[in-house]
Amino acid sequence: HVFRRSDVARLRLTLREGLAPIELHVVHLDLYFFHDLDLVQMNLEVRADNLPLATVREILFRFGRAYPSGWDEEGEGLHNVYLAEWLGADGQVIARSDSAQRTKYLSFVCEHRSPNISEHWACLLRPLVLAHSDEVGALRYRLIEYHRMPVMAYIAMDQPRTLSREDWIRTGLATMLHPDEALPVNVPWIAEFEKRYCQDRYWTNTASGPNTRFISTGNAMTVVGDADSRFFLDNERGVLAQFRHQYFLVFLIAHLHRASLLVFSEVLVDAVNDLDIRNDVSVRRFKRRIRANFETFLRFTHRYWFHELSERPHVQAIFRMCARHLRNDALYDEVRSEIREMSNYLDSDSQRRQSNTVVRLTVITILGLIATVTTGYFGMNIIPFGEGSVLERILHGLIASSIFVGLVLFAVARSKRLSDFLEAVSEEKLSFSKKTRALWKALLGKEA
């Protein structure tokens, strides 16, 4: 299911303290619910015109963080925007960020061992409320990964062919590189930038074009093209339309795979942490959670997990690049192995319980065989049950039934020890005295 919120019209960002705020238009704000997977993904699209490239990179780096990654000496949040404000159609502020409230975030983490999120993001998600918060809400959520949100960027710029290699790197890796830091030219992912992250099927670097470059790091996808190209700007049939409706789905599916696998892994961890092997209720709850998680994983594998997404080689290459950088295949193998181990544990535990049941039934059968042979030898009419009054026969039946039930229950209670005794009897190397001690232990529960 997809739910759309329409009361948020604009986003006002103050990137750093003292800078003039920037207003971006909110195109749409959606929540994607995957009920099968207990997963929610938020999709926010904003746009702006005539921004400097440096400002675009700053927005990509600072915006889209669920909570501050730290605080500076003045108490302001690190790496996030100084202030983010959601505005309604009438210009009124709906919510604003609170990254400077350091105590709020730290106290929440200390109490719940889970991160809090900034107020402007929490406002967008209401009536959903954070899992450990004090807010009242029927639906609760929690982050399944770190604070950096996946981001897609569509950049139409004048003369993209004039960009230097450093500009390309800083634009494509804007979410990873701090705008004020020098470029780390010696690290492999910078030296191999074009090979690792660029898909240049539609980049010719010629005057006739096309000059559209796709850059994917897994957590971010950036499409850069020529602002003078009508096809690049066409929102019905051009690259912009493909970006919104096709490449968005490619990016969404790749992150759906990763998010789902992280959910499965987290459910396993929670189930193990909640397990108390000395508590039967906890053990039964653990088994139910593991089996339910296994069933959901099977549905995910057959419904959502696939590698071939499109017949177009370029789209398929983009999808594979995203999935490779997100390590989806390795994560899938890891989660599948964990679930298989849990399933094998439950199967072995069930087999152990069945074996114990078979042992008990075997002991009871042997005791019943003794009783059957004995009564068969002496005949079934030793006691004239058919004679006497009706009351005497009823009383006789109740007493006999009570005795037999008591013997069966005693045999069940001592079945493990009686099984050990039968094993001792079948052992030819044991002496008669040791076999007698085994019988004594089976009946009384202690050594002779």
Identify the function of each model-found stretch.
Residues 190-193, 295-298, 315, 421-425:
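Extended hydrophobic/Leu-rich segments
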Residues 1-12:
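Long, charged/polar, low-complexity intrinsically disordered N-terminal extensions
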Residues 50-59, 164, 169, 279-282, ...:
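Alpha-helix capping and helix-coil boundary motifs
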Residues 6, 69, 97-99, 107, ...:
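Generic serine detector
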Residues 329-448:
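Hydrophobic alpha-helical transmembrane segments and their immediately adjacent juxtamembrane loops
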Residues 243-384:
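Membrane-associated alpha-helical segments
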Residues 16-276:
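Extended alpha-helical interaction modules
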